[in-house]
Amino acid sequence: MSELATQKAGEGTVSRLLNVVESELQAGREKGDPTEKQLQIILEDAPLWQRFKEVTNEMIVTKNGRRMFPVLKISVTGLDPNAMYSLLLDFVRTDSHRWKYVNGEWVPAGKPEVSSHSCVYIHPDSPNFGAHWMKAPISFSKVKLTNKLNGGGQIMLNSLHKYEPQVHIVRVGGAHRMVMNCSFPETQFIAVTAYQNEEITALKIKYNPFAKAFLDAKERNHLKDVPEAISESQHVTYSHLGGWILSNPDGVCTAANSNYQYATPLPLPAPHTHHGCEHYAGLRGHRQAPYPSAYMHRNHSPSVNLIESSSNNLQVFSGPDSWTSLSSTPHASILSVPHSNGPINPGPSPYPCLWTISNGGGGPVASGSEVHASTSGTILLGNPAVTSPSSLLPTQATTSAGVEVLGEPSLTSIAVSTWTAVASHPLPGWGGPGGAGRHSSSSLDS
């Protein structure tokens, strides 16, 4: 009894499978013609192929083989649904010369290479019933093009030659005979080892679904480069402040109002940002210091203190984090700064063009004055262009000065040419039409 049940179950399974096959082939039978007189082959994605042909399509050939894009797809009707057919694909040259890409176009370039072995690709579904071939479009997506004769079902093509795919339908099962072969001019291409035309590259990326990952990665890299480019532009503007003039470059600040008077030192903390002040982290060391390292040593302190004396002169006081300056004798360093006493452009008064920076602090040096170094070495630098984040009011105050620092054991000469000061608000007591600058109360006079 159990054997009979098993036999019936097996018959039911076979019947179900045959029904699946029958229903699968039914769609193909509806398009069939036992006489094969109405046999027809249609190219799928013809508009896409035509778009590539307009700019001369290119296909990559590699040693290991590269698949085609666009993929060759065809639809077949008019086959005998019950007959067996195999579909084959090969590539034939369309002309008798090589090609080269010159000045944005393909031009003939001499005689062709000797034709290699004619390789034929057999569709992996072959052989099969005509109903199978007619039920859905036939794709040759697994075809690989190579420039080496290595077998494995790959199609060998010569680079820089133009080819056209040809589809062949062969009836099998009994006497084999050719039923039809056809080709489509839209599918012509030049075999290359790398794309020559940028338009072809763009079309491949745009329409090839397997190239979307490459496109997305390219876009991600582009978006990632945007903040890097912005950061780089900030470095170009401010990086010289970080490793050159200011002892602690973590704070870069401009006055938010014209009443810039503080009775006590004003610290510029690095960890936060407030109105009129922007924090630029990571600028220290962006550029190399302009002086030999033998004369400069770095200490560390958390902030830079700004204080304005009773004479309204802005001073910069560096904490322990400062450049250890050159040692010099009390009367060894003399600075002479020539400056034109002509009127300054109308508008906000500029910051002084020169700053003193040392361990003990120093004040701004007005144009047209002399400063005598009487402490343990003073480094006098020009004030480069500093852009105010709140308002951009460039005021040109050029000074051609020669700065000489006598140090031990050698003489260091620093030529400072054009210095530009940019102010956002006027400061009383700093220059002005017809007026000379002042020395701060902490300026060092001999």
Curated annotation (Swiss-Prot):
Protein name in UniProt: T-box transcription factor TBX19
Cross-referenced CDD domains: T-box_TBX19-like
Keywords for the protein's UniProt record, in alphabetical order: Activator, DNA-binding, Nucleus, Repressor, Transcription, Transcription regulation
PROSITE patterns in the cross-refs: TBOX_1, TBOX_2, TBOX_3
Location(s), subcellular: Nucleus
DNA-binding residue intervals: 43-216
Function of the molecule: Transcriptional regulator involved in developmental processes. Can activate POMC gene expression and repress the alpha glycoprotein subunit and thyroid-stimulating hormone beta promoters.
Entry's Gene Ontology cellular component terms: nucleus
Any one Pfam family match given in the protein's UniProt record, by short name: T-box
Main location: nucleus
